[in-house]
Amino acid sequence: MRFLIIGLIILIAYLMIRKKFSLFGFTEDMSRNLKSGFQLIEASSPVIQANLKKSVSNAMMGVVLILITVLLFMKIKIVLFLLPIAFFLLGYLFLFNNHFSKLKSQQIWYNAKTNEVFIEQLKGENYTFNMFKDIEAVQKIESIQTTKGLLYGYYRIKLKNKILEIPYLVAENKPANNLFFDTIAQNFNIVTQKRIFPII
């Protein structure tokens, strides 16, 4: 019964994320027309869908490990070590939701000629900055390990008056966004921090 409930929770979370993915959006046509000379730095649908599938796969593996732990606990208590792994895998689905929500809360526009970046926010004021004048520090916050080809993380860019956070989902849209992220990598000392769950 407990596993049925866990499975239902995962299914509901998955359906809610899929619904958010299909219904959410900026008024992109108008935005694209207004920003001549700027490239939209975004995550592609294939990248998002691939990460969602991997996250669901990891979460289901977590459910299986919990089931194995409970079934074998009375006979082999050493299987308890599987529980932390199981909850870690379950966390991937909620981590995806966190990063996807951040992804859809903002749009990043980049002008490669002027190095100007315009941030369009769903909530809050829009703002601009220059990559070579306004960036004070760059960090990468990422998971402690890659699991089944899945590595969650985000860039944390400290500006003079703002903090810009960009999920790895955006950086994975290659080669479309290579110039933007290559410019950052080549001109700033990026400090990497490892976390169990890199929640934005």
Give, region by region, the residue ranges found by the protein language model:
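Transmembrane helical hairpin unit
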Residues: 58, 66-82, 89-103, 109
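N-terminal membrane-targeting/pre-transmembrane regions
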Residues: 1-76
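Short, intrinsically disordered, charge-rich cytosolic tails of integral membrane proteins
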Residues: 177-200
